């Protein structure tokens, strides 16, 4: 099929990662919808190969990248090169909904690494909505 429609709501409920790429059959790049609860402290991480684009759909995102910390609202976005550590948190009192797109020359496999080993368990417990 040459196209596919979907919505975040169709990909699951609650907080966590929603696999847009799988649901829509995308193979050229990685893409997830991410829903963070109010006050969620993000996960500082980097990638071997994938750059990422974070797009804020709703809520507020506190983005720590390099030496900079910036708050983004709906419509805000940031591009982060693969090996640059980044952390996205939700400083607000409403859920944060983001679209995260990653890729490098068509590479879509998982290649992320947590900076703080304690975040490995926290990330695993955070939840993944299966699709």
Which residues does each predicted region cover?
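Ligand-binding loop in jelly-roll beta-barrel domains
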Residues: 25, 62, 82-108
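Short acidic-glycine-tyrosine-enriched beta hairpin
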Residues: 67-83
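Short histidine-centered beta-strand/loop micro-motifs
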Residues: 22, 42-48, 89-91
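A short, N-terminal "cap"/entry segment at the start of jelly-roll beta-barrel domains
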Residues: 1-28, 43, 109-131
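Short strand-coil-strand connectors
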Residues: 27, 64-68
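Glycine- and acidic-residue-biased ligand/ion/polar-headgroup-sensing regions
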Residues: 49-51, 55-61
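Conserved short histidine dyad/triad with adjacent acidic residue
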Residues: 17, 32-47
């Amino acid at each position: 099929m040459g196209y596919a429609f979907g919505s975040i709501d169709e990909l699951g409920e609650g907080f966590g990662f929603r696999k847009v790429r799988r649901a829509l059959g995308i193979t050229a790049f990685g893409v997830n919808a991410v829903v963070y609860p109010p006050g969620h402290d993000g996960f500082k991480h980097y990638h071997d190969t994938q750059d990422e684009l974070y797009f804020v759909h709703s809520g507020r995102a506190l983005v720590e990248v390099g030496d900079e910390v910036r708050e983004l609202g709906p419509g805000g976005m940031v591009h982060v090169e693969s090996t640059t550590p980044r952390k996205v948190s939700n400083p607000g009192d409403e859920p944060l909904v983001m679209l995260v797109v990653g890729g490098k020359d068509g590479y879509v496999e998982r290649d992320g690494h947590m900076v703080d080993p304690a975040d490995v368990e926290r990330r695993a417990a955070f939840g993944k909505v299966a699709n």
